Amino acid sequence: MKHKKTSSRAIAAQIMLQVLDHGKSLSTLIPAAQQQLDAKDIPLVQEITFGICRVLPRLEAIIQQLVTKPLKGKSRLVHCLLLVGLYQLLYMRIPVHAAVDEVVNATKLVKLDSFRALTNGVLRRFLREQQTILAKVDKHWQTLHPEWLVNMLKQVYPNWREIMDANNQRPPMWIRVNTQHCTPQDYSALLGDLAVKTTNSSACLPSSAIQLVNPLSVDKLPYFSRGWATVQDCHAQWSATLLAAKNGEMILDACAAPGGKTTHILEQAPQAKVIALDIEESRLVRVRENLARLGLTADVRCGDATTPTKWLADDVMFDRILLDAPCSATGVIRRHPDIKWLRQAGDISELVELQAKILSALWHRLKPNGTLVYATCSILPAENSEQIIQFITANPDAELIEMDFNGEKAIMKQFLPQQNGGDGFFYAKLRKLDK
């Protein structure tokens, strides 16, 4: 991509090509593309690309009805332009002529002008035959999920359709109030003064969590730059609460990026000695930014959680460890819809193996009577309850501790997407017995 402002539709198509053909994530591609876009076009590109990922099978089925010969090689970008055009026509309030013309004109910008007529013809044929085409397509279009994931969810959850429906919805915006500055009630009042509607209707939520009825830019949040609030899903906010760090304790936040959990730990225990670890240096930039905004201090380190000896002195042990383990992220598909197409069935066993290695390595660095909170944003038992059962079976010095979710007790807790308005999360809390 060239470093100049260009068509938002062309950029959206190029991003989708990277997702579908090269396995890149939207969370990486969109920030990288922002320098090529006018600021006003960034939300449009986000809406188009995230939206396409949510409903991809339906759009692909429509293209199959309209294009007799698959678009391959260089023309794959034309295929992605058609995805952009169809998404606009079906799901966005953009005038039809503008939706079509912008995509057709983009063929020239991406040096595929020879496909201009085909692109125009396909989109206009869809408009003429939309009712007939959708009647055919929608007989078979149902879950908008890859077959391997549908099968996994069917085996575990009787309400698998509800889960997938939830995955296809737009996620709400949750914030975490920094109680070092004000109470959640007072912050809700500040939002109310700005005519921002909020809710926190479920009892099974951290007290710091507030849901905004309509998403809001962070620069519009009261005193955001001064650290009064952080954007974080309500179920993710249980991580630090369950850890229950105390001032003076030695704490490890493993897999810490982008820093929401690290900062929450320090909001609750400002004098705790926290090491924030992540394997990617580039991801630690966000951790440092979040710490600075909130005026908090942690020891930020780049390292592999499976090999603590490479980033930690041999005699250092932790009172508490928060392990938000690498996972399939199947609980946050509504926030990252590209996950459906980036993950493969074979990834799950590899992730389970990695989680087990990290658990084992970090367990040796936990003090006797110390606690470890294991968390994932997955809804697959292999990464969650099965992983924990296998671990405590293999480690006689590990025991599960009952957790309290505002009066709802559990020794292992699986939140599903949309439950309480939150993302899918799993939690288990382990104590290391002094043997």
From Swiss-Prot:
Location within or outside the cell: Cytoplasm
UniProt keyword annotations, A-Z: Cytoplasm, Methyltransferase, Ribosome biogenesis, RNA-binding, rRNA processing, S-adenosyl-L-methionine, Transferase
EC number(s) for this protein?
A: 2.1.1.176
Instruction: Give the reaction(s) catalysed.
Output: cytidine(967) in 16S rRNA + S-adenosyl-L-methionine = 5-methylcytidine(967) in 16S rRNA + S-adenosyl-L-homocysteine + H(+)
Q: Which SUPFAM superfamilies match?
A: NusB-like, S-adenosyl-L-methionine-dependent methyltransferases
Q: Which Pfam families match?
A: Methyltr_RsmB-F, NusB, RsmF-B_ferredox
What CDD domains has UniProt attached to this entry?
A: AdoMet_MTases
Q: What is its main location?
A: cytoplasm
One GO BP annotation of this record: regulation of DNA-templated transcription
Residues in the active site?
A: 377 (nucleophile)
Binding residues annotated for S-adenosyl-L-methionine, in chain numbering: 255-261, 278, 304, 324
| A molecular function (GO) term | RNA binding
Q: Which GO terms describe its cellular component?
A: cytosol
Functional description taken from the UniProt entry: Specifically methylates the cytosine at position 967 (m5C967) of 16S rRNA.
> Belongs to which family?
Belongs to the class I-like SAM-binding methyltransferase superfamily. RsmB/NOP family.
Q: What is this protein called?
A: Ribosomal RNA small subunit methyltransferase B
Please report the organism this UniProt entry assigns to the protein: Haemophilus ducreyi (strain 35000HP / ATCC 700724)
Please name the taxonomic classification of the source.
Answer: Bacteria, Pseudomonadati, Pseudomonadota, Gammaproteobacteria, Pasteurellales
